[in-house]
């Protein structure tokens, strides 16, 4: 099977490999300009991610879905471990130390939830009607980890889980009566829900929302991240400042240059032309995921690929719009680009899942 999978990928999907290689190369190049040691560490994580992806390719996706509840349970347990014993850094408790490195279970919950919702919303691999009980169970399975992750605090990943859940519910189709009741109920309880949510947000999260509404009101405080990101993007011009030429990074004006705002760094260095190239490569990967879903006649493969497509599409859209100041800074990383080992492994593993679906669905 191993040789068959490799031959299939090289023969049928060379453009996919070129696009993926281009994005990973851009990632390392950009991180090198921020700090060479970051590029070296990210390169190691990319290699680890590729090995994990190779493992995913060897296991039929139907077998992975059959064990979805076990996968979900393991990752959910790790989230509780983070609450009790997690490593704390910069006011956030998100990591578990394993030897010389750390893992971030919240990132793995993205893939675990995709498996779990696929298994839950299907019955023995067959599509079934969305019942109130099925909806409630899926919602609880999403909200529980989302709540634990938001309390770390990691609002960005919690938002991503909610988006993945929404994608699945939309795919299942919601009766108009349920939509109407949900809208009326949502509007009626929104003021109360907003007050509860606002009361549980950390102060820096509130600051990000205030900064989104009016970043210029406090340019050295709440609006600093957004303003510096927009300056970085604007100063890139058409063709950028060149490798390691990003002044926002060189003079340390841009916080989170290697994580949330790495796309701003790349745009300042390579300009509009570089940004267009990167977005084109990402758009191709999203298109590949969407096409995988649409071409798969197996409901299991369809739902899995749709979940991956939603994860990549909204992940890169939210991050790009956040960098441009169109959305508030919620901490959603750019897939395959933001620095972080766990996020890189999950992103590469998700793409490997698409190839897995394409290969095994045709056998």
Task: Please describe what each predicted stretch is.
Residues 1, 31, 317-363:
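A juxtamembrane structural motif centered on a specific transmembrane helix
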Residues 1-20, 64:
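N-terminal membrane topogenic signal
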Residues 6-11, 69-77, 231-238:
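Alpha-helical transmembrane segments of integral membrane proteins, especially early/N-terminal helices
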Residues 16-225, 264-325, 349, 353:
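Hydrophobic alpha-helical transmembrane segments of multi-pass inner membrane proteins, especially
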Residues 154-159, 241-246, 257-259, 276, ...:
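Transmembrane helix boundary and interhelical junction motifs in multipass membrane proteins
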Residues 221-244:
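Extracytosolic (periplasmic/ER-lumenal) interhelical loops and adjacent juxtamembrane/interface segments
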Residues 237-273, 293:
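Long extracytoplasmic/lumenal interhelical loops at the membrane interface
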């Amino acid at each position: 099977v191993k040789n068959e999978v490799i031959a299939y990928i090289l023969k049928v999907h060379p453009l996919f490999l070129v696009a993926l290689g281009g994005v990973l190369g851009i990632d390392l190049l950009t991180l090198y300009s921020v700090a060479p040691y970051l590029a070296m560490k990210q390169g190691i994580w990319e290699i680890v991610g590729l090995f994990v992806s190779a493992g995913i390719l060897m296991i039929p996706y139907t077998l992975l879905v059959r064990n979805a509840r076990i996968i979900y349970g393991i990752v959910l347990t790790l989230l509780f471990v983070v609450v009790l014993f997690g490593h704390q850094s910069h006011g956030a408790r998100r990591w578990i130390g394993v030897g010389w490195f750390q893992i971030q279970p919240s990132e793995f919950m993205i893939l675990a939830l995709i498996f779990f919702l696929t298994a839950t919303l299907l019955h023995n691999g067959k599509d079934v009607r969305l019942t109130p009980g099925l909806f409630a169970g899926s919602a609880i399975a999403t909200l529980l980890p989302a709540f634990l992750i938001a309390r770390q605090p990691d609002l960005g990943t919690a938002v991503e889980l909610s988006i993945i859940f929404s994608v699945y519910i939309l795919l299942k189709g919601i009766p108009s009566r349920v939509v109407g009741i949900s809208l009326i109920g949502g509007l009626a309880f929104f003021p109360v829900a907003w007050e509860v949510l606002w009361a549980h947000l950390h102060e820096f999260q509130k600051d990000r929302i205030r900064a989104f509404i009016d970043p210029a009101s406090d340019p050295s405080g709440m609006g600093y991240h957004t303003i510096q990101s927009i300056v970085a993007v604007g100063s890139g011009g058409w063709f950028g400042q060149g490798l390691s030429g990003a002044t926002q990074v060189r003079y340390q004006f841009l916080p989170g240059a290697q994580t949330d705002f790495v796309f701003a760094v790349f745009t300042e260095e390579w300009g509009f032309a570089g940004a267009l190239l990167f977005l084109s490569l990402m758009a191709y990967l999203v298109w590949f995921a969407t096409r995988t879903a649409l071409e798969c006649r197996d409901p299991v493969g369809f739902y899995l690929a749709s979940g991956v497509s939603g994860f990549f599409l909204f992940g890169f859209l939210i991050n790009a719009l956040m960098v441009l100041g169109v959305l508030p800074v919620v901490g959603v990383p750019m897939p395959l680009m933001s620095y972080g080992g766990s996020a890189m492994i999950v992103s590469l593993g998700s793409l490997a899942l698409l190839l897995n679906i394409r290969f095994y669905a045709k056998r």
